[in-house]
């Protein structure tokens, strides 16, 4: 597990660092590490070293980071003309959103650059949507998409055209069964039917020691199958998210 994040010890109040720490404890190998800190930002050379070690050992890698952490590292890697070919079975999770205070990063551009630099197919890249107020998270089910076949897309082979279409549709985020999602009218807070965009509200039964119902200023819509399609922040809402925290940390170094 390689995380382009500060460690939980360095950032004890970051829910994302804490989550990554749990992943390292559960699935990490001895060389798992955190590759960012508030003083130095993302450690580009150390990321490269860790990726090269994984390739030499043919050890699959789980990469974790925010969108802006990946952009920061990609700028370093592209300046160095660095290219990697990650071992089969590797995965990448990005989170935190693509809009920052200083610029907007189109998602297709980020994924294209990650694919070119890491040699990782796009259907091995997963977006996570969550927040510190919720214990549960929502993920895109692209790693195993039932629509792609009985076995799903469980390996690194390129999907067929039919599977590719199914995987494209599976970019909608899916919630665990104990996390309820409602889309509300911004003016009346009345529930909206599938297909209409409104404010996102959650009821997380995993929040046993805190408030279970959370109303956000995020916009989205539900499809007919319960998939969540994110539409950004409500007009006038304060920008927030893990990517912004990393962006602020990186800007402080410049």
Task: Tell what function each PLM region has.
Residues 7, 13, 21-254:
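Active-site glycine/GP-rich loop and adjacent strand/helix microenvironment
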Residues 1-6:
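Short hydrophobic beta-strand segments
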């Amino acid at each position: 597990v390689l995380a382009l994040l500060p460690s939980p010890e360095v950032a004890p109040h970051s829910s994302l660092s804490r989550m990554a720490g749990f992943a390292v404890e559960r699935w990490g190998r001895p060389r798992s590490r955190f590759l960012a800190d508030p003083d130095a930002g993302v450690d580009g050379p150390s990321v490269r070293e860790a990726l090269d070690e994984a390739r030499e050992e043919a050890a699959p890698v789980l990469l974790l980071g925010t969108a802006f952490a990946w952009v920061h590292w990609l700028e370093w890697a592209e300046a160095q003309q660095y290219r990697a070919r990650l071992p089969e079975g590797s995965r990448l999770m990005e989170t935190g959103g693509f809009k920052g205070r200083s610029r907007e990063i189109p998602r297709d551009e980020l994924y294209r650059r990650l694919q070119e630099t890491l040699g990782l197919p796009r259907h091995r890249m997963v977006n996570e949507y969550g927040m510190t107020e919720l214990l549960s998270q929502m993920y895109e089910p692209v790693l195993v998409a039932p629509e792609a076949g009985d076995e799903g897309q469980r390996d690194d082979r390129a999907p067929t055209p039919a599977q590719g279409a199914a995987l494209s549709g599976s970019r909608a985020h899916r919630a665990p069964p104990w996390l309820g999602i409602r889309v509300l009218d911004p003016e009346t807070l009345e529930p909206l039917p599938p297909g209409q965009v409104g404010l996102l509200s959650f009821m997380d039964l995993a929040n046993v020691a805190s408030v279970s119902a959370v109303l956000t200023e995020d916009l989205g819509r539900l499809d007919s199958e319960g998939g969540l399609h994110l539409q950004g922040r409500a007009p006038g809402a304060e920008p927030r998210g893990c990517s912004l925290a990393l962006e602020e940390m990186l800007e402080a170094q410049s």
